[in-house]
């Protein structure tokens, strides 16, 4: 197969049905990717509820036939509807937040799609494969082998944290998946090794920005704008039902990555310090 950089992985939260114990994907719509200005750029991507294939469609399409399994479905709907969800297996309707809270631990997530940057510079959406899942499991193992890779700090109750606590997020590191924790811990280690204290502080500030865009509370804004909606976009820590996993280090076409923030924040700030435009004559 062709090798490509993955810009973003797409995940969905799951709740366990209280009636039949099957895990329910908390999609409110099967359309998971569309342009930031869909009326001008109507092409979107929808996930087949039958086989999991990624289908190209319009953002407002209401009847779609899967190109892989021929299943007809309405891409505008999903198991989740407001604060409740309907189990596709047994049709039991249950409250989402209460069901997750009673489980006593943060909800499960399922990896279902990815956006790749191909060698020719084009982007392509695709369903995830066993190889993708194996790579994630490898990250889980590598994280387990690291010595104290992240701080364990409790989340205190408050206006901005109560929603997260309601979903059983008790510690800050639980807001990240294992691959994010692995990547961020490696990056933090390298920053700590910088001998110049000024440069070390500079990159520590940049690392703080990377945390905002690389966690399970981010979501996909779509193409045509900065693709990653960071964790503080809602001014509270809102658990995202369809979180986005970005490429922590990044590529030239990434959003919210360490590399692109270096170019967009640090390099621009240094250029401005050398040549502040208000003082030009």
Features from the language model and the residues they span:
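Nucleic-acid modification enzymes, centered on SAM-dependent nucleic-acid methyltransferases
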Residues: 1-281
């Amino acid at each position: 197969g062709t090798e490509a950089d993955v810009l973003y992985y797409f995940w969905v939260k799951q709740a366990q049905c209280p009636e039949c114990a099957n895990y329910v994907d908390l999609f409110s719509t099967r359309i998971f990717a569309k342009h930031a200005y869909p009326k001008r750029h109507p092409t979107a991507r929808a996930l087949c509820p039958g086989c999991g294939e990624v289908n190209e469609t319009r953002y407002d399409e209401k009847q779609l036939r899967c190109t892989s399994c021929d299943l007809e479905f309405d891409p505008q709907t999903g198991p989740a509807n407001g604060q409740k969800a309907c189990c596709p297996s047994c049709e039991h309707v249950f409250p989402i937040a209460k069901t997750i809270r009673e489980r006593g631990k943060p909800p499960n997530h399922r990896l279902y799609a990815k956006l790749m940057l191909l060698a020719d510079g084009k982007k392509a959406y695709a369903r995830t494969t066993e190889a993708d899942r194996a790579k994630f499991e490898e990250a889980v193992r590598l994280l387990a082998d690291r010595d104290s890779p992240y701080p364990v700090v409790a989340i205190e109750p408050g206006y901005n944290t109560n929603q997260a606590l309601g979903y059983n997020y008790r510690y800050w590191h639980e807001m990240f998946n294992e691959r994010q924790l692995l990547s961020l811990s490696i990056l933090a280690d390298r920053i700590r090794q910088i001998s110049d204290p000024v440069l070390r502080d500079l990159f520590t500030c940049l690392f703080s920005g990377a945390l905002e865009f690389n966690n399970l509370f981010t979501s996909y804004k779509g193409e045509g704008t900065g693709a990653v909606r960071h964790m503080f976009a809602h001014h509270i820590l809102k658990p995202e039902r369809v979180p986005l996993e970005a490429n922590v280090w990044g590529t030239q076409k990434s959003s919210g990555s360490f590399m692109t923030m270096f170019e967009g924040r640090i390099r621009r700030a240094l250029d401005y310090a050398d040549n502040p435009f208000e003082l030009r004559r």
